[in-house]
């Protein structure tokens, strides 16, 4: 599972309740991980961290024969696509919720500003100077949930750091330029009223991807935070769609006989399919202690929930 640990906690519970083992860690500098807050020096380092961590879980005996799915929201969707690019045959599929295939023009700095910032990124990489609109206001529709997010001290709410913003921009461009290379099964979910990441680029991913098994669902009137910022009835609908998609693909032996689903155009945690969910505390060193996080170089024990 790749995304924001605070926002994805409830998502992990939903998937675990549906019978899936859910794993994740904080990105470096995010959540409870070490490092400068929300500073990304190189996006590829973040992807490498995710790759090592998730594969270490998949190599454990109890999960070795399970189907493996990526789950990514927003920036985590870009991470999921880059993990697939890094090892195209490893993952059995991905759920991509409002993926960062392209940053919306409505929150992106003016091109002239980007040019100026690029010239000083190696001099002041950690400065919080990138002008941008308030993403929390733009992402979370439900006012009560929005205020809850604002009050959480683990949620970064300053201006983006210079290097971080430029890395996100470069990554989104790279992802957008390589949409045709995506070959794994995937399910894209995107709010049509999203002003943070562009739903039209999600549609382009669906159209250009080489995947034989691909599904997209666009939700009229919904914003960026589909699983954490919408009214409860919308959140329930989104999770119902996610679990239904995973359930149809969670057995490898059945995958070969599946027919590709039709796209729902009218309307990327790693999950180990059918892993038992136990209410007991995990054994020391057991993977079951990890739930709903992001990637980072921090000790994964910090992310135990």
List each language-model region with its residue ranges:
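Catalytic nucleophile-loop/oxyanion-hole region of alpha/beta-hydrolase
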Residues: 4-7, 11, 31-67, 232-237
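Conserved alpha/beta-hydrolase
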Residues: 12-35
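Alpha/beta-hydrolase-fold enzymes
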Residues: 71-160, 164
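Active-site nucleophile elbow and catalytic-triad environment of alpha/beta-hydrolase enzymes
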Residues: 160-179
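Short beta-strand/loop motif that positions the catalytic acidic residue
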Residues: 182, 188-190, 194
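Short alpha-helix in the alpha/beta-hydrolase fold that links the catalytic acid
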Residues: 184, 198-207
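Catalytic histidine neighborhood in serine/cysteine hydrolases
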Residues: 203, 207-225
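Catalytic active-site module of serine/aspartate enzymes centered on a nucleophile-bearing elbow/loop
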Residues: 220-305
């Amino acid at each position: 599972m790749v995304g924001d640990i605070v926002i994805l906690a409830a998502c992990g519970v939903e998937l675990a309740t549906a019978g899936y083992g859910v794993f994740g860690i904080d990105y470096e500098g995010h959540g409870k991980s070490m490092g400068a807050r929300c500073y990304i020096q190189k996006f590829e380092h973040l992807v490498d961290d995710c790759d090592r961590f998730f594969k270490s879980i998949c190599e454990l005996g109890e999960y070795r024969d399970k189907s493996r799915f990526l789950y990514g929201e927003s920036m985590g969707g870009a991470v999921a696509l880059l993990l697939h690019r890094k090892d195209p045959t490893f993952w059995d599929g991905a759920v991509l919720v409002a993926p960062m295939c392209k940053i919306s023009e409505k929150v992106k700095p003016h091109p002239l500003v980007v040019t100026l910032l690029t010239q000083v990124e190696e001099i002041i990489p950690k400065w919080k100077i990138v002008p941008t609109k308030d993403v929390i206001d733009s992402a979370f529709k439900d006012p009560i949930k929005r205020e809850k997010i604002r009050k959480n001290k683990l949620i970064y709410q300053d201006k983006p750091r210079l290097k971080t913003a430029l890395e996100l921009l470069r990554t989104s461009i790279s992802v957008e330029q390589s949409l045709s290379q995506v070959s794994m099964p995937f399910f894209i979910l995107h709010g049509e009223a999203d002003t943070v990441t562009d739903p039209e680029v999600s549609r382009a991913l669906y159209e250009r991807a080489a995947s034989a098994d691909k599904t997209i669902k666009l939700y009229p009137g919904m914003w960026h935070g589909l699983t954490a910022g919408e009214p409860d009835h919308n959140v329930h609908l989104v999770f119902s769609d996610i679990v239904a998609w995973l359930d149809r693909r969670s057995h490898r032996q059945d995958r070969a006989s599946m027919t590709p689903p039709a796209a729902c155009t009218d309307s990327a945690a790693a999950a180990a399919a059918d892993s038992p969910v136990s209410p007991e505390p995990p054994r020391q060193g057991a993977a079951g202690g990890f739930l709903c996080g992001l990637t980072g170089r921090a000790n994964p024990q910090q992310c135990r929930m």
